[in-house]
């Protein structure tokens, strides 16, 4: 029995671009907004869909990164919006997030940190275990970014002259996403 399409409570808002059919005998036939909002099973279905999308993205990133990079510019606004809306989704896809640098190569956040002289999470954990008796302040890593390559070309040239790298953040959602990353990694 066809119940409805575009049920916002079943498909997370950031995944509304997905097309498909959900065959679920346990969904209630009464699809009023209040019935769906109060149904714990509907929440489980939405969480499961988010998890499966995150798993698929991670799988593509690990097994077919070249193809993943081809689609990244198209899917990144939705993934970044998903990270802002759903913390569990953000945690699952954090290692598959890519940032385009000034050479138009795609880097992960860990790669960006390494490229700018910072320490990765593994290096920081290893250092914490070896220096457990000393209290040591961790140096902050600056990652520079540009939002418009033409308008900010003088900064890009300056970065290149100094041997610095920066990431290109051209989507509208990137300003909110960068704020999210700064809060998450402080």
Could you tell me what each predicted segment is?
Residues 1-186:
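Conserved GHKL (Bergerat-fold) ATPase module
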